[in-house]
Amino acid sequence: MQEFSLWCDFIERDFLENDFLKLINKGAICGATSNPSLFCEAITKSAFYQDEIAKLKGKKAKEIYETLALKDILQASSALMPLYEKDPNNGYISLEIDPFLEDDAIKSIDEAKRLFKTLNRPNVMIKVPASESGLEVISALAQASIPINVTLVFSPKIAGEIAQILAKEAQKRAVISVFVSRFDKEIDPLAPQNLQAQSGIMNATECYYQINQHANKLISALFASTGVKSNALAKDYYIKALCFKNSINTAPLEALNAYLLDPNTEYQTPLKITEIEAFKKELKAHNIDLENTAQKLLKEGLIAFKQSFEKLLSSF
């Protein structure tokens, strides 16, 4: 299925040197993503960073973080470069800008350009959150020919707006990361059983339609947050359900490994808009609104990445 790509949503030094290479070499994945929470988990819990951290003692916390993170990003970039050289739509690794800059467009643009210039790799995507000021950042980076991963996308309306900006201005590869499973985690406790474990897929599918109205060969929907939050669901539930044409799924290792045991052989047909609208109407009958939920989840996502980044910096 050439129009569906599987990426890995995980980064850690030992993994990059071993299992990451195996996944690439056997054709299981063709890209990867990182975020502040993943780096916090890796750097604070893995023994593979400790010697380097000791050598960097005395430097500012953010400088230590960037030294460690950029080394990992470069390593991932090198491993993925053959895929990029074969097909410039694949072979990317993403690095997020400082989450504390999300409400300052000018500083975000400056940091994004600095990081991209420092890394000096064509297959590095700079991640920008879909916040209010993020739209200005996306536009500026697109015009500067920087590959972009727009993250924390929950709202179909915002997904469409971002796709419209990128369709006009993107000169390099761009993906719009639609977060999936967090919807079900938020909504399922409030919804009757017959409506559970569906909100994330319904919302993601509507985002997919919005993105594809403007998508071109440079722009794709990327489904993120595709690890399950419920033990009642198969580990690869969201990967299989959202296996659409012209889409990417970035998955945590547990979901990825489960999917690889029994991968899809055909694309899924997305639900029709009429079916999605009928589902949303049923939710509203239970006082649940997906757009309001999307706004809430964006705020929570921005806070969570700041908390992870702060925890990581304070660990130094």
Swiss-Prot record:
GO terms for cellular component: cytoplasm. It is an enzyme of class 2 (transferase). Its EC number is 2.2.1.2. The active site is at 127 (schiff-base intermediate with substrate). Pfam families: TAL_FSA. InterPro entries: Aldolase_TIM (IPR013785), TAL/FSA (IPR001585), Transaldolase_2 (IPR004732), Transaldolase_AS (IPR018225). The keyword Cytoplasm applies. Signal peptide: none annotated. NCBIfam families: PRK03903.1, tal_mycobact. Transaldolase is important for the balance of metabolites in the pentose-phosphate pathway. This is Transaldolase. It comes from Helicobacter pylori (strain HPAG1). The lineage of its organism: Bacteria, Pseudomonadati, Campylobacterota, Epsilonproteobacteria, Campylobacterales.
